[in-house]
A protein has these predicted regions:
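Core, soluble structural subunits of large cytosolic macromolecular machines
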Residues: 1-446
């Protein structure tokens, strides 16, 4: 009875076991590595990814290719997750991760065919990994400022033409140096730098600007468009009379009743804006809308206001100015206000943009230019990779020789170390060393 129920439950399930399952998993890893192998190296090729809706992405970035690929095999999905983890940790080495994992699986498959138990292979790989990490630490060197710049440039090799990679390496290094004093966590550099795209100009006309830049203009042209320092308030909500959230009807029994409702609305707005004026607010940023009646009141009090900000922009503005994000204007206190050092509007590609420079924290905006969306998006990816590497390099200034030299050295070191192991783990350590040699081979091909 139990066997019958299990049979019905697995009726539509394909089950692989034994050698067949191992071969299937290794083939999936090899296919994934083969799809991105040609992107690695100074002459690596770009990939064009075409979505179901016809849109396309042209990129040399391994993790971008993998995350946009339509993959069903569970082993391939696991490798893509490993590549994404590598990207979050180091902002580089995503393609290398897949190639190494694929080679290690193929070498492990050969050992299994020779009769080596998988647990022995896992133990041998673990020993080899620990030894490789210790040896890598031993041969690492502090690069100095010039060496850091060269390391960032090396990380971008093959992601674009020489001039583009040189340009974004310098831009990324400059941004990382400005952020260096504040430390930060894993995604610190991504959160502190906003990215905007502009169709006017070439990619080499891109620029890094201090402060938060948004394609916004003040809600009234009579409001000050340039303020040299002041107080800012951030409202996560709206500055208008909210509609009732329940179904209700109101009976008007006198000619002045409707007017009284309107006057009450105006009185509430006047009270809120008066509260801001008493606090000395110079700049008001609102996530949602601002009522037309409120605009005139803000103008009369000399408060410059902006509306319809995205949540990430509010958070970055909060960081660089020290302002707390409030949900109720009447509850804003002096301690909730932030300081900005400069505010002005600038026309970029015939569109007015607002620039707010904070005085509490470092925040920047990179303006990536290009004639097509594909070029601009790839420029942003190149900058992001360079910034991630530069930020981590400043925090942990150790580098290894490039061009596959470090992998070749570690491979030789592990082969020598394996001779000191008297058990069957020696075979797995040698297989690990052989897998490391795949990177110099691919670089020689590309």
């Amino acid at each position: 009875m139990v066997e019958s129920e299990h049979g019905e439950a697995l009726e539509d399930t394909e089950r692989l076991q034994g050698r067949g399952a191992l071969v299937n998993n290794v083939k999936a890893a090899s296919a994934l590595a083969g799809a991105i192998r040609s992107t690695l190296g100074p002459k690596g090729l770009n990939k064009m990814l075409v979505e179901a809706d016809g849109s396309s992405i042209v990129t040399n970035d391994g993790v971008t290719v993998l995350e946009n690929a339509n993959v069903e095999h569970p082993t391939a999905k696991m490798l893509i997750q490993a590549s994404s983890s590598q990207d979050r940790a180091a902002r580089d080495g995503t393609t290398t991760t897949i190639i190494l994992a694929s080679e290690m699986l193929q070498n492990a498959m050969e050992l299994v065919s020779m009769g080596v138990h998988p647990s022995v292979i896992v133990n041998g790989y673990s020993i080899a990994l620990s030894e490789a990490i210790e040896e890598a630490k031993r041969i690492a060197r502090a690069p100095g400022k010039t060496g850091m710049g060269l390391a960032v440039r090396t990380a971008l090799e093959g992601k674009g033409d020489t001039r583009t990679c040189d340009f974004f390496a310098k831009l990324a290094m400059g941004a990382a140096e400005r952020l260096a004093q504040e430390g930060g966590g894993e995604d610190f550099e991504r959160l502190r730098v906003k990215r905007i795209q502009v169709s006017e100009g070439e990619i080499l006309d891109s620029e890094l600007v201090d402060g938060l830049i948004l394609p916004k203009s003040r809600v009234d042209i009579h409001m000050p468009d340039s303020i040299n320092g002041g107080l800012v308030a951030i409202l996560d909500g709206e500055l208008e009379q909210r509609s009732l959230e329940i179904s209700a009807s109101i009976e008007i029994d006198s000619p002045g009743a409707l007017s009284a409702f309107h006057e009450k609305k105006i009185e509430n707005l006047r009270s809120q804006i008066g509260h801001l004026a008493k606090l000395g607010v110079d700049l008001l940023v609102v996530r949602d809308g601002i009522a037309d009646e409120a605009i005139n009141m803000l103008t009369s009090h000399g408060i410059t206001a902006y509306r319809r900000f995205e949540r990430p922009d509010l958070e970055l503005l909060s960081v660089i100015t020290g302002a707390k994000i409030s949900r109720n204007i009447m509850e804003i206190s002096p301690n909730d206000l932030g300081d900005f050092s400069n505010h002005f509007e600038r026309r970029i590609s015939d569109v007015k943009h607002t620039i707010i420079e904070g005085s509490k924290g470092t925040g920047m905006t990179v303006i990536v230019r290009g004639t097509s969306k594909t070029i601009r998006e790839e420029g942003i990816r190149i900058f992001d990779d360079g910034l991630g590497v530069a930020h981590r390099l400043i925090r942990n200034p150790d580098v290894l020789p490039g061009g596959g030299a470090s992998y070749a050295h570690l491979s030789r070191y592990l082969r020598s170390f394996a001779l000191s192991c008297a058990n069957r783990e020696q075979l797995a350590i040698e297989a690990f060393a052989s897998a490391l040699e795949s990177i110099p081979r691919v670089l020689a091909e590309n």
